[in-house]
C-alpha cells in the first residue's frame, strides 16, 4: 500500500496554484434578432461603443450606429447573405480604421482602403481612424497659397486657395466631374497629392476616369477611392471619410493635398437609406436630423495647417448634383453653407456650347482671392464685372433695333471674353498663359 503524506499533497496543490497562469478573455457577444436590407438588429451587446466594428459568424463586419435600450442597430459592410437570425455577433473593441501610407499613390481602392485594381497588395506604414477630429482653430492658418485648376474662368474669377472648401454644383451632365479631373491633371507640376472619391458611381465611369488620369500622367500622384453603385449603402456612406483619412496622412506630413468628393448627394442618399431602415425619425425630404453634421464633420477636416504642424494643407472640392437647377433644395443649401464658395455649372450654358459652363454671376470664392497671384489679380480684377455687364447688355440688345458705337464695342469685347474663357476638356492651361491670354 502506498504511503500518502498529507504535507506532500498540500505542497503539490500549492505549487499548482502558484504556477496557474491563464489569461481570462471576456468576449462581448450578442444575438441577431433580425437581419435584412443591409441592417441587423442585435440583442445582448451591453458594452458596445457607437461606431464600433462588430463581427458576425460569417465574418461580415458591421458598424454599430443605433444604441437603443434593448438592442443595437448595425449597418452591414457586406452582403451579409449568410447571417441568420439567432446567430452570434462579437464586438471587436475597435472603431473603423484603415491602413495608410505612400504605397497608396497610383492605386484604386474600395471604401475600406482594400486594393481593387488587380496590382497586388499595398504596403501600409500605419493606420488612421476613418472618422477623426478636424483640426482646431489654433492649429490652422489662413488660406494664402493658390490651387491652380488650369481652368481660366476659375483661376481668374473664382480663385481657390490651399485649405479651402469650394463646392462644384450643377445639374447632371453639366461637366462637374470634368472640372475636378482637369484640376487633378493640372497638379502635375505643383507637387500636390490628389485623392478622388467616387461615391455611388458606375464602375465603367470610374474605369474611364482612371484611364484618363493614367493617359495624362496624373495617376502617379493620385489615389482613387471607389464605392460603386452596387455596393452596400454603408460603403457609399463611409467612402468620403476613407478618402479624407488618406489625404490627412499626407497633410500631417506637411504635403499639400487635394480631395474631390464625387458626389456628396449620393452619400446623403445612402445615409438616408440607412437611417430610415434603422427607424430614425425622418425630417425634411426624409433625410435624418443629423444630415448637416454628416457633411460638416467631413468638410471641416479640410484645412491649411499652421507652420508648427508642418504647413500641410487639404483642399476639398465637394460635388453636389442639383435637380433642374434648384440650388435651394435641402442638401445643396446645407453644403453651400458649409463651404467657402461655390462654382455653379449651368445646363443652359452647357447646351449653348459654352464649356466649362460656369455661371460666373452666382459663383463665388469667399477666401480664395487672398491666395490669388498678383499678376492674375492685376489682369482679372474687373473681369467678373465686365462679364456681368455684357450679359445684361446682351439681354437688352435683343429688344433694341439700333445700338450706339460704345454699346457695340462693349458687346464685341464681351463676346471675345466669353470665347477666350471657353476651354476643351482635359486640357488645363498654365497660369502664365492664362495671364497672357486675359
Swiss-Prot record:
Top EC class of this enzyme: translocase
GO molecular function annotations of the record: ADP binding; ATP binding; proton-transporting ATP synthase activity, rotational mechanism
Membrane association type: Peripheral membrane protein
Gene3D superfamilies reported for this sequence: 2.40.30.20, ATP synthase alpha/beta chain, C-terminal domain, P-loop containing nucleotide triphosphate hydrolases
Main location per the UniProt record: plastid
Thylakoid is among the record's keywords: yes
Binding site for ATP: 170-177
Family matches, as InterPro entries: ATP_synth_asu-like_sf, ATP_synth_asu_C, ATP_synth_asu_C_sf, ATP_synth_F1_a_nt-bd_dom, ATP_synth_F1_asu, ATPase_a/bsu_AS, ATPase_F1/V1/A1_a/bsu_N, ATPase_F1/V1/A1_a/bsu_N_sf
Location in the cell: Plastid, Chloroplast thylakoid membrane
Reaction(s) the record says it catalyses: ATP + H2O + 4 H(+)(in) = ADP + phosphate + 5 H(+)(out)
EC number(s) per entry: 7.1.2.2
Subunit record text: F-type ATPases have 2 components, CF(1) - the catalytic core - and CF(0) - the membrane proton channel. CF(1) has five subunits: alpha(3), beta(3), gamma(1), delta(1), epsilon(1). CF(0) has four main subunits: a, b, b' and c.
Family note: Belongs to the ATPase alpha/beta chains family.
Protein name: ATP synthase subunit alpha, chloroplastic
Amino acid at each position: 500500500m502506498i504511503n500518502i503524506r498529507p504535507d506532500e499533497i498540500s505542497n503539490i496543490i500549492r505549487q499548482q496554484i502558484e504556477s496557474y497562469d491563464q489569461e481570462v478573455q471576456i468576449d462581448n457577444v450578442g444575438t441577431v434578432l433580425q437581419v435584412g436590407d443591409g441592417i441587423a438588429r442585435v440583442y445582448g451587446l451591453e458594452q458596445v461603443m457607437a461606431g464600433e466594428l462588430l463581427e458576425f459568424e460569417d465574418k461580415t463586419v458591421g458598424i454599430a450606429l443605433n444604441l437603443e435600450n434593448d438592442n443595437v442597430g448595425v449597418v452591414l459592410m457586406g452582403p451579409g447573405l449568410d447571417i441568420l437570425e439567432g446567430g452570434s455577433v462579437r464586438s471587436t473593441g475597435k472603431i473603423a480604421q484603415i491602413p495608410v501610407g505612400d504605397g497608396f499613390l497610383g492605386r484604386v481602392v474600395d471604401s475600406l482602403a482594400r486594393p481593387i485594381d488587380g496590382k497586388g497588395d499595398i504596403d501600409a506604414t500605419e493606420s488612421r481612424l476613418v472618422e477623426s477630429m478636424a483640426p482646431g482653430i489654433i492649429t490652422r492658418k489662413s488660406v494664402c497659397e493658390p490651387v491652380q485648376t488650369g481652368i481660366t474662368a476659375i483661376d481668374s474669377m473664382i480663385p481657390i486657395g490651399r485649405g479651402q472648401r469650394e463646392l462644384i454644383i450643377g445639374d447632371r451632365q453639366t461637366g462637374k466631374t470634368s472640372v475636378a479631373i482637369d484640376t487633378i491633371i493640372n497638379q502635375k507640376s505643383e507637387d500636390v497629392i490628389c485623392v478622388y472619391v467616387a461615391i455611388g458611381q458606375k464602375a465603367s465611369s470610374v474605369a474611364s476616369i482612371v484611364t484618363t488620369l493614367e493617359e495624362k500622367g496624373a495617376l502617379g500622384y493620385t489615389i482613387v477611392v471607389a464605392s460603386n453603385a452596387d455596393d452596400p449603402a454603408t460603403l457609399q456612406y463611409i467612402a468620403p471619410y476613407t478618402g479624407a483619412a488618406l489625404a490627412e496622412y499626407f497633410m500631417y506630413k506637411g504635403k499639400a493635398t487635394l480631395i474631390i468628393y464625387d458626389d456628396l448627394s449620393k452619400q446623403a442618399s445612402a445615409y438616408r437609406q440607412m437611417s430610415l431602415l434603422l427607424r430614425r425619425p425622418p425630417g425634411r425630404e426624409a433625410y435624418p436630423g443629423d444630415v448637416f453634421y454628416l457633411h460638416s464633420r467631413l468638410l471641416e477636416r479640410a484645412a491649411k495647417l499652421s507652420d508648427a504642424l508642418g504647413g500641410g494643407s487639404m483642399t476639398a472640392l465637394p460635388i453636389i448634383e442639383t435637380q433642374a437647377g434648384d440650388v435651394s433644395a435641402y442638401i445643396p443649401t446645407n453644403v453651400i453653407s458649409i463651404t467657402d464658395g461655390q462654382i455653379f455649372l449651368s445646363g443652359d450654358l452647357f447646351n449653348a456650347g459654352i464649356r466649362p459652363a460656369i455661371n460666373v454671376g452666382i459663383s463665388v470664392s469667399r477666401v480664395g482671392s487672398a491666395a490669388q497671384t498678383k499678376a492674375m489679380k492685376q489682369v482679372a480684377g474687373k473681369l467678373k464685372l465686365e462679364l456681368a455687364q455684357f450679359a445684361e447688355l446682351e439681354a437688352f440688345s435683343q429688344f433694341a433695333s439700333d445700338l450706339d458705337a460704345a454699346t457695340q464695342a462693349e458687346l464685341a469685347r464681351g463676346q471675345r471674353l466669353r470665347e477666350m474663357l471657353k476651354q476643351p476638356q482635359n486640357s488645363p492651361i498654365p497660369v502664365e498663359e492664362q495671364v497672357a491670354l486675359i
